[in-house]
């Protein structure tokens, strides 16, 4: 996780949510907003995903943004969100929810998964693909992945 240090010592305070405020801090004034990041040799910080979006599949931590960045490059894909859905053996598995470019030839689920597997480790790629009409982006362009996951976890 990416942590910040607030010189005032206050850190971050969530309105009317003291539990969330406390969980964000590892020490007074040192807090996280839930971003996963890394720093390169030159000192540049790169945000890679949100901790809350991480999928744990068979003990492996999978960051959906990796597969999303690969699959959005496929000519068939107009928009994408990868989420964790239940898997009896693995706990969770990665599922790609995709809005397609209807003006292009249709790609199969296998073709899209193979496209991803050619570029990153197999375990980081979706095990299934679902074509959807809408990902529910808000006015800021953000996707509420918790809301997208909810229907898949109703019976779990």
Task: Please identify what each model-predicted range represents.
Residues 3-5, 12-13, 20-29, 34-124, ...:
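AMP-binding/adenylate-forming catalytic core of the ANL superfamily
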Residues 129-140:
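Short proline/glycine- and acidic-rich turn/helix-capping motifs at secondary-structure junctions
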């Amino acid at each position: 996780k990416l942590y910040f240090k607030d010189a005032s010592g206050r850190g971050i305070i969530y309105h009317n949510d003291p539990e969330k405020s406390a969980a964000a801090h590892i020490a007074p004034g040192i807090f996280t907003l839930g971003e996963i990041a890394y720093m390169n040799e030159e000192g540049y910080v790169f945000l890679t995903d949100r901790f809350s979006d991480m999928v744990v599949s068979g003990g492996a931590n999978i960051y959906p943004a990796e597969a999303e960045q690969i699959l959005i490059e496929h000519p068939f894909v107009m928009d994408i969100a990868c989420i964790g859905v239940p898997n009896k053996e693995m706990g969770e598995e990665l599922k790609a929810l995709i809005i397609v470019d209807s003006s292009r030839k249709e790609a199969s689920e296998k073709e899209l998964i193979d496209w991803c597997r050619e570029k990153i480790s197999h375990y980081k790629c979706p095990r299934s693909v679902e074509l959807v009409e809408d990902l529910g982006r808000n006015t800021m362009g953000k996707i509420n992945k918790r809301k997208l996951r909810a229907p898949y976890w109703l019976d779990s």
